[in-house]
């Protein structure tokens, strides 16, 4: 069986933690920020975790992370 290839786009967006969870960044922070409240923008800077429903798909994209 050949080696699995890492999805390069996913590798730039996700990181595996020591416990096996997958960290991700929040969306909606690239542009059109003047209409967002400061509190909202501050909350969006924090990282989040990939949901259980998506965990298997993302884990397959980054097999060696």
From Swiss-Prot:
UniProt GO cellular component terms: cytosolic large ribosomal subunit
GO terms classed as biological process: translation
Region ranges (Disordered): 1-28
Top-rank taxon: Bacteria
Keyword Ribonucleoprotein applies: yes
One Gene Ontology term of the molecular function aspect: structural constituent of ribosome
Keywords: Ribonucleoprotein, Ribosomal protein
InterPro entries: Ribosomal_bL35, Ribosomal_bL35-like, Ribosomal_bL35_CS, Ribosomal_bL35_sf
HAMAP family named in the record: Ribosomal_bL35
Family statement drawn from the similarity comment of this UniProt entry: Belongs to the bacterial ribosomal protein bL35 family.
Name used for this protein in its record: Large ribosomal subunit protein bL35
Organism: Acidobacterium capsulatum (strain ATCC 51196 / DSM 11244 / BCRC 80197 / JCM 7670 / NBRC 15755 / NCIMB 13165 / 161)
